[in-house]
Regions:
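Conserved N-terminal entry element of GNAT/NAT acetyltransferase domains
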Residues: 1-15, 158-176, 180-183
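Conserved GNAT-fold acetyl-CoA-binding loop/helix
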Residues: 22-48
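A short helix-loop-beta-strand connector motif used in the catalytic cores of GNAT acetyltransferases and
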Residues: 46-62, 79
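Conserved beta-strand in the GNAT
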Residues: 62, 68-79, 84
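A short, internal acetyl-CoA/4′-phosphopantetheine-binding micro-motif in the GNAT/acyltransferase core
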Residues: 64, 83-91, 118-119
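Conserved acetyl-CoA pyrophosphate-binding loop and the N-cap/start of the following alpha-helix
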Residues: 89, 93-101
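Conserved GNAT acetyl-CoA-binding A-motif
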Residues: 106-117
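Conserved beta-strand-loop-alpha-helix junction that forms the acyl-donor binding cleft
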Residues: 116-126, 143-148
Length: 183
């Protein structure tokens, strides 16, 4: 399996982000956005990831196992914007490692509370975040993508989330460790 490492994304990682996002979203959201009715927005997402790498406000972390990208997280001041992991890595610690590093980044800013949006129907992601100290704060929105499912806003008081020890290399998790996908 090999050790997992986390690195900062570079300016040319937009296609890597797109590929991970597409693969993980197609697996995680199959019941929410059935692909026979709702096509994945390829062109729009390619542009989103290209802009995220250039905007100067977004930090992007990429998880790699044996040199291959397996997941990523995006953070902007006070917000965990995205956390996606390829399905073959679900339950293997990549999501937990990305989350922990993202929380460290969030804690290094001025915010005392971090927030994220998660799809209400994505129970797996909700459990993942709740296990790590995130709580539904009552905020509600609708996804910008048809069929416009409900999104829940979760909050984490920084300093209370589960974090990895300092460092950016993570050993293999025990077989029972949970790992989820951002909603």
């Amino acid at each position: 399996m090999g050790a997992l490492s986390i690195r900062a994304a570079g300016p040319n990682d937009d296609e890597t982000l797109f590929a991970i996002h597409r693969e993980s979203a197609m697996a995680a959201y199959v019941e929410i956005f059935p692909p026979d009715r709702y096509r994945f927005p390829d062109a729009e997402m390619r542009e989103v990831w290209a802009l995220a790498l250039r905007d100067g406000k977004t930090s992007v972390l990429i998880a790699e196992r044996a040199g291959s990208p397996v997941g990523f997280a995006t953070v902007s001041p006070g917000w965990l914007r995205n956390l996606f992991v390829v399905p073959t890595e679900w339950g293997r610690g990549a999501g937990a490692a990305l989350h922990d590093e993202a929380v460290v980044l969030l804690g290094s800013g001025d915010a005392s509370i971090a927030q994220l949006w998660v799809l209400e129907e994505n129970e797996r992601a909700r459990r993942f975040y709740e296990t790590r100290g995130w709580r539904d704060d009552g905020g509600r929105s609708r996804s910008g993508f048809p069929p416009h499912p409900v999104e829940l806003r979760y909050a984490l008081r920084l300093g209370e989330g589960r974090r990895a020890p300092p460092g950016r290399t993570h050993p293999e998790p025990p077989p029972t460790q949970g790992d989820e996908l951002r909603g």
